[in-house]
Amino acid sequence: MPSALAAAMADGLRDNPVINYAIAVFIVVALIYLAVLQFWVLLRTRKHLSEMKSAYSEIEIQRSELQLRNKDLTDSLNYARRIQAALLPSEHHIRRIFPDYFIYYRPKHIVSGDFYWFSERDDKYFIAAADCTGHGVPGALMSMIGLELIHKIINDMKVDDSDQVLLTMNRELESAFYKEESGKPIIKDGIEMSICIIDKKTRLMEFSGAFLPVYIVRDDKLIEIKGDKKNVVQSFAMVSFNRSTFTLQDGDLLYLFSDGYADQFGGPDNKKFMYRRLRHILLTISKYPLPDQQRILDETIDSWMEGHDQIDDMMILGVKPF
């Protein structure tokens, strides 16, 4: 009975034109709504795509501008590197003084805050290694000032004592950086530096250091002469530096360096290389020809870094004076 009733009601609905019309209107309205909704979604999608395309174009423009600026900056740094290289002693000049030497010189960026100096005057050899505060452009500018000053102090002012070289450089930098108008130094950066002055006749070496030491390898032993724990132009107060002496023999090796090699992070635990490892490797490789020593130092630090970024400029000088 209920099934027969339901069938009768269904037949009645199909035969009712009002209901059929209402259903048709509902279906048409639903289709129109869906069409409008789809059209609206399409417009929003097109607008979004247009905005994305505009943003992408803007990003491409900015990327092109950044690439151009980076190229300009890199070109400027490369040119600055050539200027810096022109100020550093040439290979021909150094080899004329010390036929047996190497220079491991590895800037963090294109230009370096480390610099070295070799000179010969009045039967004396002059060797210096310096590490200016910072690296990159600021360090390079400071190093260029330091190169000009050491040339002036040793060759023009003819300062012969190692401690006086550091003291004179301190005074020259003080004069350059101190401004009476404000009563304060405009630059507080300093220079870590080591300098050896060797008398060719007596073979007596004078050494003074501002933080940096000198290593001497003789008969499979490493001798360290430490520098003072103060920078050149660390402060503008009255300063002084100690002077040590050491008589060199045939076959002695001198190593001067900045702190970049020892401070480089790496290894299995991402720790600093440290000076004890540097002393060990220098003593180990001291029996090899100096060009081979330079290669081994480069390979060693590359292996130690294991993909880590270089954190500072690196410089190691190896010299056999006699």
Where are these regions (language model features)?
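Active-site-proximal, acidic helix/loop segment immediately C-terminal to a metal-coordinating Asp/Glu
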Residues: 137-160, 248, 252-308
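Non-catalytic regulatory/interaction regions at protein termini and inter-domain linkers
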Residues: 1-14, 290-304, 317
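N-terminal membrane insertion elements
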Residues: 1-53, 268
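Exposed alpha-helical structural elements
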Residues: 8, 72, 82-83, 168, ...
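Generic recognition of well-structured, leucine-rich alpha-helical segments
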Residues: 39-41, 176, 285
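… and, occasionally, acidic/histidine-rich disordered N-termini of signaling adaptors
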Residues: 57-254, 308-322
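Residue-level detector of alpha-helix boundaries and kinks
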Residues: 30, 37, 68-69, 154, ...
